[in-house]
A protein has these predicted regions:
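Bacterial N-terminal signal peptides that target proteins for export
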Residues: 1-9
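C-terminal motif of bacterial Sec signal peptides marking the signal peptidase cleavage site
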Residues: 16-20
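Positively charged, phosphate-engaging catalytic surfaces used for nucleic-acid and nucleotide handling
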Residues: 23
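Insoluble glucan recognition modules
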Residues: 26-59, 63-73, 85, 99-128, ...
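Intrinsically disordered, low-complexity boundary segments flanking structured domains
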Residues: 64, 79-80
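Beta-strand signatures of extracellular beta-sandwich domains
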Residues: 74-78
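Surface-exposed loop/edge segments in extracytoplasmic proteins
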Residues: 83-94
Length: 161
């Protein structure tokens, strides 16, 4: 009889232990109802070739919302001249998942300004950045924009004799 009671006690303890391991915490999948917000580290950037390796600009953003679905959110970041309505935009980040910032050095940002936007040395260009967040299997898109200006420089030749 003692043997059956001990088996019954162990069976009940096992059931209690297994039922205590249920994880009902779904907050990691539910990004909540956060508003998508894009921010720039600086609103006015003057690039200097002597600091070519330093960080020039960082654009960072909040997660936005996945509407409680638990689905992944992908982000697309575009840059364009102010007032162009993103007609000929530079796509900095495309369909990135779990990426919440974009950072460029002085040299990298100057190259983007000169090669894509046609900037010349000393020219101050007003830019807009637009972040679009898309949730898998949802039609709604979340959009946030921010504005900043950048002054380019004319790099010295990279060929040395």
């Amino acid at each position: 009889m003692k043997k059956y009671i001990s088996h019954l006690v162990f069976a009940l303890l096992g059931c209690a232990a297994l039922s205590a391991c249920v994880d009902d915490d779904y907050m990691e999948l539910d990004k909540g109802q956060n508003e998508l917000v894009l921010t720039a580290s600086k609103t006015e950037v003057v690039l200097n070739e002597q600091a070519h390796a330093d960080d020039a600009l960082e654009l960072s953003w909040t997660t936005g919302t996945n509407y409680g679905t638990g689905n992944k959110i992908s982000y697309t970041l575009e840059l364009t001249k102010t007032g162009s309505d993103f007609a000929d935009s530079y796509v900095a980040v495309e369909n990135a998942v779990q990426e919440y910032s974009w950072k460029k050095s002085v040299e990298e940002l100057n190259d983007i300004l000169r090669n894509h936007f046609g900037a010349t040395a000393g020219e101050n260009i007003s830019l807009e950045a637009r972040l679009t967040a898309t949730v898998t299997e949802r039609d709604e898109k979340q959009v946030s924009t921010t504005a900043f200006s950048v002054t380019a420089y004319n790099p010295l030749t990279s060929t040395l004799y």
